[in-house]
Amino acid sequence: MKPSKHLIFALFALAISQPTMAAPQPIDRVAVQINDGIVLESEITNMIDTVKANARAANQSLPSDSALRTQVIERLILTRLQLQMADRIGLHIGDLQLDQAIENIAREQKMTVAQMQQKIESEGLSFGQYREQLREEITLGEIQRIQVQRRIQVSPQEITGLVKLIQEQGMKDVEYQIGHILIDVPNNPNSEQLEASSKRANAVLERLKSGEDFRRTAIASSSGPKALEGGIWDYMNINEMPTLFAEVINGAKKGDIIGPIKSGAGFHIIKIMDARGLQTKEIEEVRARHILLKPSPILSEDRAKAMLEQFLKQIRSGEAKFEDLARQYSEDPGSAAKGGELGWAEPSIYVPEFAQTLNSLSQDQISEPFRTTHGWHITQLEERRKTDATDQFNTNRAHQLIFRRKFNEELQNWLDEMRADAYIEVFQPESNRG
């Protein structure tokens, strides 16, 4: 059954009808209904203002207000659908995990949290707003990881094939920054609809070849996933990027415009915004051990953190050994029996919070308790070493490249499926109504 918008409008009508002695204020309105949720006009206005401010700061031109509004509404719809999914599966980012993320960001920027707060507030954003924006970003990242990762399979044959290619090419591949515009077509289009989309794509291509700004054109015309970023995909090598890109850009040079290319989604136009060579380098590996406690209905967040703080005191005083506590208490089945030992690995294979913590430690140092998606940890950095790229590295690299390519493709498929299954209604602004 489709959600009814009448209750929503009734609540707003009730709010409007209440007497007040204050001066009249502009009344916010429902701009979009997404399943049982809504997007307010003020949310759209605020996001448009943010995009415009960012464009001014970057000296970047923008399309018409109506085209920009369409892109912003689409972004808000997809964001809200993902947050609704997170809520349905019980995914919530708590304050302790959020605090840990903020500490990591401050550390990366070589600031204290207080200094970072001061900088944020000097730029006109309250620290409370920043926290909630970051909580939303972390939630989106986690729900994408949870929902998309399980849709991806990387076969041994794919890895073997790519390892062979990597060995043939070496690690001096080229990374491309891609500009992408998608002129979409309706579901099950007829010949007239296909022809209309094809003409639109060719018209866009001609404007680009005549020197029209790519980013502005993408924001105004593209239905692709990066439209609001000017259609720009960050640097990827040919093995990381979506298959459609990889099939057409091999050998292309900076500034080349390719297309239109027809696919099931529509007509694609691709521009090589930049290209750079990959440099080979030594790999830094770390040997570490950790103790993991997983919060549960029996073990609260605060209790898990307090237990690890107590373990730290016992280790530092010589009352207990790290490996003994790991065997007794750690809830990581892969390392607990080995005294928490994780073996040699690149830090980047771990979740971001764990990798950032390892990178901040000196040899033999034990971290303070910190939170990741897996739970609460303390970790000790035992050794660092530099190694050359090995067969195992090539295998890991191949898996990572294939996974990233498939993740980008499956993420868009997942978003498209959610949108197709959702009840969405966009209400026209008052000024556009007859």
From Swiss-Prot:
- Report the subcellular localization: Periplasm
Q: Where is the PpiC domain?
A: 173-274, 283-383
Signal peptide positions on this chain = 1-22
PROSITE patterns listed in its UniProt record: PPIC_PPIASE_1, PPIC_PPIASE_2
Supply one GO CC term from the record.
outer membrane-bounded periplasmic space
Question: Keywords assigned by UniProt?
Answer: Chaperone, Isomerase, Periplasm, Repeat, Rotamase, Signal
Official protein name in the record = Chaperone SurA
